[in-house]
C-alpha cells in the first residue's frame, strides 16, 4: 500500500494532536505527535512528540482523558513557534501527504495553530488523508481509533496520547 502512495507523494506525515477541548478556534494543542515516512516507506529521524504549554489552566476532564498534567506542560512544554517550525519543516518536499485518524479534528487545530503564528503557508502544498474515512468504508460503527486498533488486531495502545495514537494510526 505504501508503495502506491509514493508514486504520487514524496513523503507521508502521520500526525495526531491532543488539545484543551474540541473547539479549534478557542482551544489549544497541548501535544503534537507526528512521524515522517520517506519514499522507501521508512520512518525518518523526524519522529516528534511535542508538548506545548497552553498558557492557561488545563481542564480537569482533559487530564482525566489523556493523563496529561498541567504541571508537565508548564515545565516541559515548548514554545509554540518552535513546535510550528518543527512541523512545517517535516512538510519539506514537493508533494507531502498528511494523514490523521479523524483528520478533520486534527487538521482544524493544526491550521488555526499555524495560522495564529503566521506559518499556515506550509500546509498549502500538502494533501490530506483521513484514515478514519478508509476505516468507515470497511467496518461498521463505531469508528473510534480504539475500534480500528481492535478490529485490525494492531499491537499498541490508543491512549489519547499523541505519540501512541500516531503509531496506532500508522499500523
Language model segments and positions:
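Short alpha-helix plus adjacent loop in nuclease-associated cores
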Residues: 127-143
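Short, glycine/acidic-enriched loop or turn micro-motifs at the edges of active sites
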Residues: 19-21, 133, 168
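A short acidic, often aromatic-flanked loop/helix-cap motif at beta-alpha or helix-coil junctions
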Residues: 54-56, 136, 165
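Acidic, divalent-metal-coordinating active-site segment for phosphoryl/phosphodiester hydrolysis
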Residues: 161-171
Amino acid at each position: 500500500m505504501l508503495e502506491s502512495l509514493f508514486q504520487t507523494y514524496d513523503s507521508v506525515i502521520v500526525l495526531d494532536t491532543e488539545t484543551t477541548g474540541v473547539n479549534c478556534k478557542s482551544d489549544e494543542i497541548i501535544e503534537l505527535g507526528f512521524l515522517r515516512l520517506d519514499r522507501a516507506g521508512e520512518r525518518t529521524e523526524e519522529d516528534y512528540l511535542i508538548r506545548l504549554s497552553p498558557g492557561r489552566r488545563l481542564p480537569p476532564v482533559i487530564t482525566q482523558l489523556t493523563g496529561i498534567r498541567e504541571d508537565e506542560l508548564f515545565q516541559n512544554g515548548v514554545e509554540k513557534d518552535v513546535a510550528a517550525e518543527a512541523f512545517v519543516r517535516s512538510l519539506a518536499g514537493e508533494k507531502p501527504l498528511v494523514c490523521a485518524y479523524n483528520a478533520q479534528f486534527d487538521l482544524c487545530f493544526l491550521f488555526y495553530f499555524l495560522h495564529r503564528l503566521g506559518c499556515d503557508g506550509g500546509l498549502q502544498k500538502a494533501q490530506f488523508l483521513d484514515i478514519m474515512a478508509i476505516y468507515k468504508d470497511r467496518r461498521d460503527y463505531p469508528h473510534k481509533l480504539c475500534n480500528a486498533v481492535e478490529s485490525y488486531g494492531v499491537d499498541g495502545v490508543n491512549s489519547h496520547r499523541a505519540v501512541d495514537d500516531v503509531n496506532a494510526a500508522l499500523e
